[in-house]
């Protein structure tokens, strides 16, 4: 029996297109109906979050934010370390090529004149000499094992002993607050008599010209002082100094260091140590000098708006005559009082997470602003707040934070303002530089005239670096 042929599934194009249109329209109608259906639920389970009735909700949220911040810092540090490793590999390749070239020249010189062999070898050693400050692997292991104050003090002493010139970086908004006389005494008491100390006032774009001139005049009574604008300026900065741009100040500092190195006729390269409080811009100064000396070179030191970005010694070679050493920021508190801790948090030298009472830090900031006329009013204008009626410091701080909490929606159950959340807003804006502030230098009188250095010494040091251009 002959088998029947199977029926063909072939259809006309007209029928096939009509079926496709019907199917698409049906899917579109179903999708529209699903959107209108109030019983529609996502397949992904939604996190209900922390209930408002939970008593420790603020602490848990703070811990979550802190963990996020730590992860971001670790990510930035890993990225920066990768860039540094790449830069170091490039330097090693350049050094290898240079050493090969030197060896070839030495062979040619020896063949032409054998008597000059010893002199040439000495010059070659001087070109390649680099003071070994610290073994990076052993230092990282020691820091992981012990990150206490003693460990950082030990590294600070290494920087001072190994450096010929010390650049003490200060914040232009409060140079006296970011200055430690203990550091100056340790530098002057070091074994090397030829060691020089220079004040570098960084972040000058955040203060008016009149205030900057006062601070430069005041600090030059102690040590040679240089105003510096290491970065191109923050987005919140609206204070411009036409005579002190970033390129001009960096170029002048680089010329001064090279001039001092040429006058001293050092056999090895000049080692410049950069020290200062956390978050004053030490790494930014080094990155600016590197970028200026080597056109377009990537930044070798990680820099950021968070205190403690630099955790180990970092040596950067500019050329055969100049080396820079970046050091971790070390805090030298004057006392163990709460006010001194609040002052360090205000300077962003210590993280605000180290303080249990952010309201006290915000109150300290308000007290600081009230000392300089007009600064407290400018901060009220920034937050668009009306003038406060209370006269006492405690009442003023409380009313200020209550207004901030209401304006930013930081309210708890029953509409009660969350003062801690409002204080954290103020502290974060302060650290980010969104609030303008600066301190005024004190007048030198008989009480503090004993701390002033010898005028002749300061003048001689300034001449050695040709600092008359600043």
Curated annotation (Swiss-Prot):
Would the keyword Membrane be found if you checked this record's keyword annotation? no
Describe the outcome of a gene knockout.
20-40% of cells exhibit morphogenetic aberrations represented by irregular, uneven, or overdeposition of septum material as well as septation and cell separation defects, often resulting in pseudofilamentous or multiseptated cells, suggesting a failure of cytokinesis in those cells. Cultures of null mutant cells did not appear to exhibit a growth arrest.
Ligand binding (GTP) = 202-205, 276-283, 326-329
Subcellular location(s) of the protein: Nucleus, Nucleolus
- Classify the main location: nucleus
The GO terms describing molecular function are: GTP binding; GTPase activity; RNA binding
GO CC aspect terms: nucleolus; nucleus; preribosome
Q: Where along the sequence do coiled-coil regions lie?
A: none
UniProt cross-references to InterPro entries, sorted A to Z: G_CP_dom (IPR030378), Gnl3_N_dom (IPR014813), GTP-bd (IPR006073), GTP-bd_ortho_bundle_sf (IPR023179), P-loop_NTPase (IPR027417), TRAFAC_YlqF/YawG_RiboMat (IPR050755)
GO BP annotation list: assembly of large subunit precursor of preribosome; protein transport; rRNA processing
Which ranges carry the CP-type G domain? 153-333
| Compositional bias (Basic and acidic residues) | 17-27
Q: What ranges does the record give for the region RNA-binding, renumbered to this chain?
A: 405-415
Q: What does the comment on domains in this protein's record state?
A: In contrast to other GTP-binding proteins, this family is characterized by a circular permutation of the GTPase motifs described by a G4-G1-G3 pattern.
The cross-references to PANTHER family, in alphabetical order and at most eight, read: GTP-BINDING PROTEIN-RELATED, GUANINE NUCLEOTIDE-BINDING PROTEIN-LIKE 3 HOMOLOG
Tell me the function of this protein: Required for optimal growth. Required for normal processing of ribosomal pre-rRNA. Required for nuclear export of ribosomal protein rpl2501.
| Family, as annotated | Belongs to the TRAFAC class YlqF/YawG GTPase family.
This chain belongs to the protein called GTPase grn1
Q: Which organism is it from?
A: Schizosaccharomyces pombe (strain 972 / ATCC 24843) (Fission yeast)
Q: Which gene encodes it?
A: grn1
């Amino acid at each position: 029996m002959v088998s029947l042929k199977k029926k063909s599934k072939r259809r006309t194009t007209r029928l096939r297109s009509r079926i496709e249109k019907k199917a698409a329209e049906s899917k579109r109608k179903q999708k529209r109906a699903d959107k209108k259906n109030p019983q529609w639920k996502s397949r992904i389970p939604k996190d209900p979050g922390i209930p408002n009735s939970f008593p420790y909700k603020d602490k848990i949220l703070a811990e979550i934010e802190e963990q996020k911040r730590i992860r971001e810092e670790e990510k930035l540090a890993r990225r920066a370390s990768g860039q540094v490793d790449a830069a170091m590999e490039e330097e090693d390749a350049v050094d290898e090529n240079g050493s090969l070239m030197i060896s070839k020249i030495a062979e040619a010189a020896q063949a032409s004149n054998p008597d000059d062999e010893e002199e040439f070898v000495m010059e070659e050693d001087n070109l390649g000499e680099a003071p070994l400050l610290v073994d990076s692997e052993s230092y990282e292991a020691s820091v992981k094992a012990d990150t206490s104050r003693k460990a950082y003090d030990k590294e600070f002493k290494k920087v001072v002993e190994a450096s010929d010139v010390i650049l003490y970086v200060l914040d232009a908004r409060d140079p006296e607050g970011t200055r430690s006389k203990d550091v100056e005494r340790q530098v002057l008491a070091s074994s090397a008599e030829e060691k020089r100390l220079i004040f570098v006032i960084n972040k000058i774009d955040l203060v008016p010209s009149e205030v900057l001139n006062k601070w430069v005049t005041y600090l030059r009574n102690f040590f040679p002082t240089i105003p510096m604008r290491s970065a191109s300026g923050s987005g919140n900065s609206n204070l411009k100094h036409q005579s002190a741009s970033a390129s001009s100040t960096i170029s002048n500092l680089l010329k001064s260091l090279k001039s001092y190195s040429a006058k001293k006729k050092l056999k090895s390269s000049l080692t410049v140590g950069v020290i200062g409080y956390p978050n004053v811009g030490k790494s930014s100064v080094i990155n600016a000098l590197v970028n200026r000396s080597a056109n377009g070179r990537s930044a070798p030191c990680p820099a950021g708006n968070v205190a403690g970005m630099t955790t180990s010694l970092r040596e950067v070679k500019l050329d055969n005559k100049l080396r820079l050493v970046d050091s971790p920021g070390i805090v030298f508190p004057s006392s163990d009082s709460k006010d001194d801790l609040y002052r360090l948090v205000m300077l962003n030298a210590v993280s605000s997470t180290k303080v249990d009472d952010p309201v006290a830090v915000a109150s300290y900031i308000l007290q600081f602003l009230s000392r300089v006329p007009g600064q407290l009013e400018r901060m009220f204008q920034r937050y668009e707040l009306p003038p406060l009626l209370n006269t006492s410091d405690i009442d003023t701080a409380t009313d200020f934070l209550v207004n901030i909490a209401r304006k930013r929606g930081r309210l708890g159950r029953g509409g009660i303002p969350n003062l801690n959340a409002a204080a954290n807003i103020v502290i974060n804006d302060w650290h980010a530089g969104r609030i303008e502030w600066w301190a005024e230098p004190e007048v030198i009188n008989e009480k503090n005239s004993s701390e002033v250095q010898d005028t002749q010494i300061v003048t001689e040091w300034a001449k050695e670096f040709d600092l008359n251009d600043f």
